[in-house]
């Protein structure tokens, strides 16, 4: 896997999969190495974030993930793009259909995702990682410009200020730094879309 694909794969997995999964638990050991996995503009800042990153106990982190990503009652920070981009904050709206069409045009079909929209933040990072792993930088950049960046920074801003989980707030800070660096380094021009959340 190309080095450019590694960090979005790790971040995507942390945003998408439950911390109960053994493969996600293994990623926690990688957190101190994140500064080495990407040519950060401010590596010292990332080193500081990762060095002081504390993990709650397993049960607490599982509960936090459930509240923030699966929903227990009203979700404080929904992780789906359509909530931010659709006027009525609906899941599986027109923006999700547009993103699904983009994925299909790249040969990416999520047949086992029938119950969850493809525009979940972590799942989008995983798709970006797959495109980078295939060497398709143009499609990866298009995914970011048209589908993730128009709402992603708003989502990450809200997640940084959540009162449920300091761990996921820190993850949002690191992901924000990553996406800002990618945007600057690749010269990306995100589509300007109105946000409703």
What are these regions (language model features)?
Residues 1-197:
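Charged, alpha-helix-forming regions
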């Amino acid at each position: 896997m190309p080095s450019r694909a590694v960090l979005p794969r790790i971040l995507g997995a942390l945003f998408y999969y439950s911390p109960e999964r053994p493969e996600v638990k293994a990623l926690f050991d990688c957190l101190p190495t994140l500064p080495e996995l990407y040519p950060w503009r401010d590596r010292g800042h990332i080193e500081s974030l990762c060095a002081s990153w504390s993990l709650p106990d397993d049960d607490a982190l599982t509960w936090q993930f459930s509240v923030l990503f699966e929903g227990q009652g009203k979700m404080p920070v929904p992780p789906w793009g359509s909530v931010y981009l659709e006027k009525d904050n609906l899941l599986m709206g027109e923006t999700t259909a547009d993103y699904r069409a983009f994925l299909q045009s790249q040969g990416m079909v999520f047949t086992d995702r029938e119950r969850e929209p493809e525009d979940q933040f972590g799942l989008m990072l995983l798709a970006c990682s797959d495109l980078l792993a295939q060497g398709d930088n143009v499609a990866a950049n298009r995914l970011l410009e048209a589908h993730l960046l128009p709402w992603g920074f708003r989502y990450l801003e809200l997640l940084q200020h959540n009162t449920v989980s300091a761990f996921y707030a820190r993850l949002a800070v690191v992901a924000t730094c990553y996406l800002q660096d990618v945007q600057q380094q690749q010269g990306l021009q995100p589509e300007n879309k109105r946000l409703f959340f």
